[in-house]
Amino acid sequence: MDNIIDGKKLAENVIAKVKNETEKLKNSHNIQPGIAVIIVGDDPASQVYVASKSKKAEECGFFSMKHVLPKEVEESELLQLIEILNSDPKIHGILVQLPLPAHINTDRATQAIAVEKDVDGFHYINIGKLAANAIKDAIIPCTPAGAMMMIEQQCGQDLSGLNAVIVGRSNIVGKPMAALLTAANATVTLAHSRTRDLDEICRRADILIAAVGRPQMIKKHWVKKGAIVIDVGINRIAAPEKGPGKTRLVGDVDFEEVKGKTLAITPVPGGVGPMTIAMLMVNTLKAAARSLKLPVPKF
């Protein structure tokens, strides 16, 4: 269907521009963007995510470094590694793959990353800049940044007169998404799983962002005809039709039921996910440019 937003294709276009801008940095200023990824333990899902990020970084022409720490590593050792990377001029972006083991304080780890190298956009200073509408100076969390690019592709950069509803209030997606949409002049409602009359609120949305972590929660009767639906959810559910014990990935939106009612909708997989990794590359490229006080490439 023509109304399905192809996240893979859009991400490929973003990556092509990142490659081009990386070549310019190398040729004009002899600088290669560098990213360091830290993974603690051997969680299979985390291993897959880290491998895809590292592969994409190398594809972009970045210097890429991966640090694998044992699950039982002391928090102090992790913080010491972050401090070393903070001081390394070859590294412009640092990310700690989440989740971390229970004995490590996630906030202490993410806040230890230098603000200018916080390419996940999780540092309180970057969050504060975004909330204060100082977007040009902030590093924007990757998933909201990617979702926003998809929305702009459909609606343009000025969302005046449009109602946007976000279902999900996380610091990683919901809250930064609300700030970005507000900055683009949308009228924003930030809802969550405990919001009263949630289906009715969703039906008012010209732009509906689902980021609540509940598989196929958003049904057809929740969606306004002609809405743009961005599904950030990624959930694994049983797929007995594939065989015993098999699973499949679905979003927070009941895609098959909802898609015919929308102006545009993102699938899961192949929607927001590829854009998240693409925006991580964008953030790293921008961090490298800022490190030399060069103009920041626009995307």
UniProtKB/Swiss-Prot annotation:
CDD domains: NAD_bind_m-THF_DH_Cyclohyd. NADP(+) binds at G168, R169, S170, S193, I234. Pathway: One-carbon metabolism; tetrahydrofolate interconversion. One of its GO terms (biological process) is purine nucleotide biosynthetic process. Signal peptide: none annotated. Transmembrane segments: none annotated. InterPro entries: Aminoacid_DH-like_N_sf, NAD(P)-bd_dom_sf, THF_DH/CycHdrlase, THF_DH/CycHdrlase_cat_dom, THF_DH/CycHdrlase_CS, THF_DH/CycHdrlase_NAD-bd_dom. Homodimer. Catalyzes the oxidation of 5,10-methylenetetrahydrofolate to 5,10-methenyltetrahydrofolate and then the hydrolysis of 5,10-methenyltetrahydrofolate to 10-formyltetrahydrofolate. Belongs to the tetrahydrofolate dehydrogenase/cyclohydrolase family. This is Bifunctional protein FolD. It comes from Bartonella bacilliformis (strain ATCC 35685 / KC583 / Herrer 020/F12,63).
